């Protein structure tokens, strides 16, 4: 008799995806982040579901309902902070996952890569709408500023913004629809994750050398299940340390002030994981130009497969490209820092230089250096 795990219509899909899946024998811990992202998504959906049971999406009661969750609901405080800091862990894993893809040339699998970019946009949209829900000062003003950027779109901009707001300002209708979409999107993301995995399993995983590993594969279970559990334990340790010791470390104190349309906070800024894009937006003195740069800062990932000029897939054996990759990483950290600073010198010029360097590195320096490396290796 065949093993049920290999014959049952449903279980065999799970078996072929997570148990008997052939995986390269040499993939490093950088390949852990996919499973960590799946766990983050599951955690966010579960904590979010329980929070939604007690939250009210009305401007008069939203702020108080979050306070009620923290004070009166059994373990409500841990649900709320797991959800808020879980989002931070989600983005740390996301950025490391994308960085891994860039470093090891995983973008050559273009279907998987493109679905990944759409997933990144969807997660960013979900996180933005979630930040609006507690209805604190930064929630309200963040929603106002970011949605207002759409008014830069020629001809339809103003109407589009008012259509999204459901009125002439961010108000009751905006909060209700943001809650509806914030609840819905994670389930759409879950479906897209399945498509992401479907395309990945068509080609199989890449590996640190960038060389096909079809002749040297091992089963996913037990080797990589155990390896993923180690990654999970490390992530959970960091998350629980954040939640239990300093839950507000990554948040903004202004969000503990109820939303007040008549009082603007001195520095409007998004959560830390959007600061690099916010810095790029602010570095361009023109509204439409800034919005375009903001979108392109993420959308640029879509053309990276076209900019791959190297004869090697991975950066493992390309020390010059490695230097450029770490320069890009340092540049993104600089942009993140600048995004949280007030709009004054020297921050303005640093932000502008870092923004120029970001696009220059990806669009010009990386392809040129890859070509130079080919010549140096006489390829």
Swiss-Prot record:
Family annotation (Pfam families): Cytochrom_B_C, Cytochrome_B
Gene Ontology CC: mitochondrial inner membrane; respiratory chain complex III
Cofactor binding comment, as recorded: Binds 2 heme b groups non-covalently.
UniProt membrane topology term: Multi-pass membrane protein
Signal peptide: none
GO-annotated biological processes: mitochondrial electron transport, ubiquinol to cytochrome c
Cofactor(s) annotated in UniProt: heme b
Residues holding a ubiquinone: 201
Record key words, sorted: Electron transport, Heme, Iron, Membrane, Metal-binding, Mitochondrion, Mitochondrion inner membrane, Respiratory chain, Transmembrane, Transmembrane helix, Transport, Ubiquinone
Main location: mitochondrion
PROSITE patterns xref list: CYTB_CTER, CYTB_NTER
Molecular function per GO: metal ion binding; ubiquinol-cytochrome-c reductase activity
Localization annotation: Mitochondrion inner membrane
Job description of the protein: Component of the ubiquinol-cytochrome c reductase complex (complex III or cytochrome b-c1 complex) that is part of the mitochondrial respiratory chain. The b-c1 complex mediates electron transfer from ubiquinol to cytochrome c. Contributes to the generation of a proton gradient across the mitochondrial membrane that is then used for ATP synthesis.
Record's miscellaneous remark: Heme 1 (or BL or b562) is low-potential and absorbs at about 562 nm, and heme 2 (or BH or b566) is high-potential and absorbs at about 566 nm.
Subunit structure and binding partners: The cytochrome bc1 complex contains 11 subunits: 3 respiratory subunits (MT-CYB, CYC1 and UQCRFS1), 2 core proteins (UQCRC1 and UQCRC2) and 6 low-molecular weight proteins (UQCRH/QCR6, UQCRB/QCR7, UQCRQ/QCR8, UQCR10/QCR9, UQCR11/QCR10 and a cleavage product of UQCRFS1). This cytochrome bc1 complex then forms a dimer.
Protein name: Cytochrome b
Gene name tied to this protein: MT-CYB
């Amino acid at each position: 008799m065949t093993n049920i795990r290999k014959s049952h219509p449903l279980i065999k899909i799970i078996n072929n995806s997570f148990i008997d899946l052939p995986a390269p024998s040499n993939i490093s811990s950088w390949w852990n982040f996919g499973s960590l992202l799946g766990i983050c998504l599951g955690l966010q959906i579960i904590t979010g579901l329980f929070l939604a049971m007690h939250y009210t999406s009305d401007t008069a009661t939203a702020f108080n309902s979050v306070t009620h969750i923290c004070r009166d609901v059994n373990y409500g405080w841990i649900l709320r902070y797991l959800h808020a800091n879980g989002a931070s862990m989600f983005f740390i894993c996301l950025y490391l996952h994308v960085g891994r893809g860039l470093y090891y040339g995983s973008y050559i699998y273009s279907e998987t890569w493109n679905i990944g970019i759409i997933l990144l946009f969807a997660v960013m949209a979900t996180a933005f709408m979630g930040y609006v829900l507690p209805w604190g000062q930064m929630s309200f003003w963040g929603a106002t500023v970011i949605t207002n950027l759409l008014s830069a779109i020629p001809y339809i901009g103003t109407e589009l913004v008012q259509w999204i707001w459901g009125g002439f300002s961010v108000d009751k209708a905006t909060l209700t629809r943001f809650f509806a979409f914030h609840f819905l999107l994670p389930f759409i993301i879950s479906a897209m994750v399945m498509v992401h995995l479907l395309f990945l399993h068509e080609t199989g995983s890449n590996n640190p050398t960038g060389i096909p590993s079809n002749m040297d594969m091992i089963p996913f279970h037990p080797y990589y299940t155990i390896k993923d559990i180690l990654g999970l334990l490390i992530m959970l340790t960091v998350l629980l340390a954040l939640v239990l010791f300093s839950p507000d470390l990554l948040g903004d104190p202004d969000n503990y002030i109820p939303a007040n349309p008549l009082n603007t906070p001195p520095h409007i800024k998004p959560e830390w994981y959007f600061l690099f894009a916010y810095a790029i937006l602010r570095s361009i003195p023109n509204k439409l130009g800034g919005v375009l740069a903001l979108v392109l800062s993420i959308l640029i990932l879509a053309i990276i497969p076209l900019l791959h000029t190297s004869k090697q897939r991975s950066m493992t054996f390309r020390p010059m490209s490695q230097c450029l990759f770490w320069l890009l990483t340092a540049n993104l950290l600089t942009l993140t820092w600048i995004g949280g600073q007030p709009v004054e010198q020297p921050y303005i010029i640093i932000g502008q230089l870092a923004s120029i360097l970001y696009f220059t590195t990806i669009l010009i320096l990386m392809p040129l250096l890859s070509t130079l490396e080919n010549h140096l290796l006489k390829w």
